Design a protein with these regions (language model features):
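Zinc-dependent deaminase
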Residues: 1-20, 36, 82-150
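Small-residue (primarily alanine) positions within well-ordered alpha-helices
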Residues: 10, 14-17, 27, 38, ...
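Short beta-strand scaffold segments in enzyme catalytic cores
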Residues: 25-34
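Short beta->alpha transition motifs characteristic of CBS
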Residues: 37-44
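A short, polar/charged loop-to-alpha-helix boundary motif
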Residues: 46-56
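Short, charged low-complexity linear segments at domain edges
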Residues: 56-69
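Immediate flanking context of iron-sulfur cluster ligation sites
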Residues: 68-80
Length: 150
């Protein structure tokens, strides 16, 4: 599976999350061999858990499935730039690569805000890449919040 196909799966998860009333963010975690280890969307409201971001859920699911807290070689695909909490989990899990579609100037921690992986205290720095239609990914979020305001 290539980056565009995997990010499309993450966007589908984001749309499903939005359909459940969650902020529409989706994530997919692939093994080094390109197999889907886990895929999910935000479930913060459903689980009554502020840490139930899509990235956290797929990291937890993959670690449990593999019976290993290290996800070395794995690539995380996310519809939106990960926040600081998720960046910390990415580093702790040793995810090798992170690919996201839309930037998050307000809450992102990769290209914006704390730039988590650029900090001298960060012990693991995954490769960062972009894929997918950033405008389309951003529009999913914009439409979700527009509908909530009306």
């Amino acid at each position: 599976m290539n980056d565009e196909q995997a990010i499309a799966l993450a966007l589908a998860e984001a749309q499903q999350a939005g359909g459940r009333g969650e902020v529409p963010v989706g994530a997919v975690l692939l093994s080094a061999a390109g197999e889907v280890l886990a895929r999910d969307g935000n479930r913060i409201l459903e689980k009554k858990d502020p840490t139930a971001h899509a990235e956290m859920l797929v990291i937890r699911a993959a670690a449990a499935a593999l019976a290993n807290e290290r996800l070395t070689g794995a690539t995380l695909y996310v519809s939106l730039e990960p926040c600081a909490m998720c960046a910390g989990a990415i580093a702790m899990a040793r995810v090798s690569r992170v690919v996201f579609a839309a930037e998050d100037p307000k809450g992102g921690a990769i290209l914006h805000g704390p730039r988590f992986f650029e900090q001298p205290t960060c012990h693991h720095r995954p490769e960062i890449a972009r894929a997918g239609d950033a405008a389309a990914a951003g529009n999913v979020l914009k439409e979700f919040f527009r509908a909530r305001r009306s």
